[in-house]
Amino acid sequence: MSTSLVSKPLASKAVVVFSGGQDSTTCLIQALTQYDEVHGITFDYGQRHREEIEVAKSLAKRLKITSHKVMDVTLLNELAISALTRDAIPVSHELMENGLPNTFVPGRNILFLTLAGIYAYQLGADAIITGVCETDFSGYPDCRNDFVKAMESALVQGMDKQLKIITPLMWLNKAQTWALADKYQQLDLVRHHTLTCYNGIIGDGCGDCPACHLRKRGLDDYLQDKTAIMASLDASEPNA
């Protein structure tokens, strides 16, 4: 599995798991420079921040990707009780008794990557791209590299098809993720037109939820020392 930035395509077609947030939009922007066809797949699971679906649709049109599928997986909402699936549960900055944030949706990335794998199979795509990140992850076990490796192996074995799950952000911190968007001259688009906020506010968000805190801290760090952070991003590329 490739977790680093790639400089040339691994396949002519890629499926990007695309929420309309900072991370997946940055991955989508990069993929457009690397693949002949980029297909986005967005999941409607009855999420608290439902505005992200419309944001994803708008960005898909704006960036002129090959196709964009919105898939109804609201059955996940019936099983996975979380602050992101229940409006009555406030988003908390504290961890639950099990050590996880209350915004964790159990099984979400298992389901998303499985469905993205099936979609890639039908399209003849050899790559799934997802914006999960272990460096600055929010405590979600399904954002870890070991999890992604296990999912890739399961998909390859289960569908008897060579398929890579590519995670361009896995070892980047949030400041480097901003640098990556800037590298492709899309920092303003990512800053002002994506939706990361758990409370559904586009751009800089509510400023209070954990997602907004992480996003803002990364942006502040990048803007304070763009040259050094861009250099650290470049150094993380293969053969740098």
Swiss-Prot record:
Keyword ATP-binding listed: yes
Annotated cofactor note: Binds 1 zinc ion per subunit.
Pathway assignment: Purine metabolism; 7-cyano-7-deazaguanine biosynthesis
Residues the record lists as binding Zn(2+): C197, C206, C209, C212
Signal peptide region: none
GO molecular function: ATP binding; ligase activity, forming carbon-nitrogen bonds; zinc ion binding
Swiss-Prot/TrEMBL keywords: ATP-binding, Ligase, Metal-binding, Nucleotide-binding, Queuosine biosynthesis, Zinc
Top-rank lineage group of the source organism: Bacteria
Pfam families recorded: QueC (PF06508)
Cofactor: Zn(2+)
EC number: 6.3.4.20
Family per record: Belongs to the QueC family.
HAMAP family, per the entry: QueC
Protein name: 7-cyano-7-deazaguanine synthase
Gene name linked to the record: queC
